[in-house]
Amino acid sequence: MDPCECSKTGTCKCGDSCKCTNCSCTTCKKSCCPCCPSGCTKCASGCVCKGKTCDTSCCQ
């Protein structure tokens, strides 16, 4: 089951800078789509993009 409420088509936009394909929600957990910047550590609670850099502002 996907905890992210979004369709599986379109473009997902996480915050102001993150984008990924195959979903169309405004906030994305890692189970929805890989929105985090490349190399960003995935958080246990799911990753939510909040910026371009891989730091504490990336995940919540």
From Swiss-Prot:
Instruction: List the residue ranges of the region (Beta).
Output: 1-28
Give me the residues that bind a divalent metal cation 1, please: 4, 6, 20, 23
Where does the chain bind a divalent metal cation 2? 6, 12, 14, 25
Q: Which Pfam families match?
A: Metallothio
Q: Where does a divalent metal cation 3 bind?
A: 14, 18, 23, 28
Which residues does the annotation say bind a divalent metal cation 4?
A: 32-33, 43, 47
For this UniProt record, the keywords arranged alphabetically read as follows: Metal-binding, Metal-thiolate cluster
- Domain of life here? Eukaryota
Family matches, as InterPro entries: Metalthion_dom_sf, Metalthion_dom_sf_vert, Metalthion_vert, Metalthion_vert_metal_BS
Q: Where is this region: Alpha?
A: 29-60
Q: Which residues bind a divalent metal cation 5?
A: 33, 35-36, 49
Extract the PROSITE patterns matched here.
Answer: METALLOTHIONEIN_VRT
Instruction: List the PANTHER family hit by this protein, alphabetically.
Output: METALLOTHIONEIN, METALLOTHIONEIN-1X
Domain note:
Class I metallothioneins contain 2 metal-binding domains: four divalent ions are chelated within cluster A of the alpha domain and are coordinated via cysteinyl thiolate bridges to 11 cysteine ligands. Cluster B, the corresponding region within the beta domain, can ligate three divalent ions to 9 cysteines.
Name of the protein: Metallothionein A
